[in-house]
From Swiss-Prot:
<dbReference type="GO" id="GO:0008948">
    <property type="term" value="F:oxaloacetate decarboxylase activity"/>
</dbReference>
<comment type="function">
    <text>Catalyzes the aldol cleavage of 4-hydroxy-4-methyl-2-oxoglutarate (HMG) into 2 molecules of pyruvate. Also contains a secondary oxaloacetate (OAA) decarboxylase activity due to the common pyruvate enolate transition state formed following C-C bond cleavage in the retro-aldol and decarboxylation reactions.</text>
</comment>
<dbReference type="GO" id="GO:0046872">
    <property type="term" value="F:metal ion binding"/>
</dbReference>
<protein>
    <recommendedName>
        <fullName>Putative 4-hydroxy-4-methyl-2-oxoglutarate aldolase</fullName>
        <ecNumber>4.1.3.17</ecNumber>
        <ecNumber>4.1.1.112</ecNumber>
    </recommendedName>
</protein>
<dbReference type="Pfam" id="PF03737">
    <property type="entry name" value="RraA-like"/>
</dbReference>
<dbReference type="GO" id="GO:0008428">
    <property type="term" value="F:ribonuclease inhibitor activity"/>
</dbReference>
<keyword id="KW-0456">Lyase</keyword>
<dbReference type="GO" id="GO:0047443">
    <property type="term" value="F:4-hydroxy-4-methyl-2-oxoglutarate aldolase activity"/>
</dbReference>
<feature type="binding site">
    <location>
        <position position="97"/>
    </location>
    <ligand>
        <name>substrate</name>
    </ligand>
</feature>
<feature type="binding site">
    <location>
        <position position="98"/>
    </location>
    <ligand>
        <name>a divalent metal cation</name>
    </ligand>
</feature>
<comment type="similarity">
    <text>Belongs to the class II aldolase/RraA-like family.</text>
</comment>
<dbReference type="InterPro" id="IPR005493">
    <property type="entry name" value="RraA/RraA-like"/>
</dbReference>
<dbReference type="InterPro" id="IPR036704">
    <property type="entry name" value="RraA/RraA-like_sf"/>
</dbReference>
<comment type="subunit">
    <text>Homotrimer.</text>
</comment>
<feature type="binding site">
    <location>
        <begin position="75"/>
        <end position="78"/>
    </location>
    <ligand>
        <name>substrate</name>
    </ligand>
</feature>
<dbReference type="InterPro" id="IPR010203">
    <property type="entry name" value="RraA"/>
</dbReference>
<keyword id="KW-0479">Metal-binding</keyword>
Length: 162
């Protein structure tokens, strides 16, 4: 499904919240959307690795890395695994790496920036907890839609207007 966030904002102004414009689009899909799975972690992508190994079922992984610009929470191997396992997209409040390869993956990816250094793997983080960044609280089970215009969230699934 191709999503256009301005059209969704126009059709559902009472439902959507718009994330502050700070993200760049790095993935092979320029638009994506789905039900959210959330992770809160800091410079440790152990939970990201665990989740992309699971069936994505068209969902979106939202990773709150605390906005850290010191380590990459997603690289090409995890992005390719997420695409293979049916994830619609990944939003990282932090950095990613291997951006040239990720741009070819059948996956939506938005992040703050790229950084070549990988994270430590200490098994630290929280899964499916509400996370807040960009002026919005992302709640597990709610919905996220993203394209080159921005990222929006909604408590319920949205359909593109006719």
């Amino acid at each position: 499904m191709h999503y256009i966030t301005p059209d969704l904002c126009d059709a559902y102004p009472e439902l959507v919240q718009v994330v502050e414009p700070m993200f760049a689009n790095y993935g092979g899909r320029d638009s994506f959307g789905g039900q959210m799975v959330t992770i809160k972690c800091h410079e440790d992508n152990s939970l990201v690795k665990e989740q992309v190994d699971l069936p994505g079922e068209g969902r979106v992984l939202v990773v709150d890395g605390g906005g850290s610009l010191r380590r990459a929470l997603l690289g090409d191997m995890l992005a390719e695994k997420a695409a293979k396992n049916g994830w619609a997209g990944i939003v990282v409040y932090g950095c990613i790496r291997d951006v040239d390869v990720i741009a070819q993956a059948d996956l939506g990816v938005q992040a703050l920036a790229s950084h070549p250094m990988k994270t430590d793997k200490r098994g630290i983080g929280d899964l499916n907890v509400p996370v807040t960044f960009g002026g919005v609280t992302f709640k597990p089970g709610e919905y996220l839609y993203a394209d080159n215009n921005g990222i929006i969230v909604s408590p319920q699934a949205l359909s593109m207007p006719e």
